[in-house]
Amino acid sequence: MAHKAIHRFARISPRKVRPLADLVRGKYADEALDILRYQPHRGARLIEGVIRSALGNAQDPDQNPGRTINVDSLFVAEVKIDGGPMFKRIRPRARGMAYPILKRSSHITVTLEEV
């Protein structure tokens, strides 16, 4: 059974988070948390939080009635980093011109499955 968690509207560019998602895809959940814990990137904290949330969802008795989940047997089946909405800002330039600034956001989706 799949256990899912989503962090929507994360204020970080998808381009900065996708390499971190590639590091943990297919790994066991506890191993993925260990990998992310020692990454010096801000996106690692975000993915780590989503994995912890998915682990909590897996242990929730309301979502899994009558089943006990062994957390050690869960692995990261899917990590999707989708682009969210962009905030549009303007950077003033010389001679009255302006350049656009796109402040990008991300939707981070993690799916855990049992081995």
Task: Outline where the language-model segments fall.
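Structured, basic alpha/beta domains of bacterial-type, RNA-associated proteins
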Residues: 1-12, 18-23, 28-115
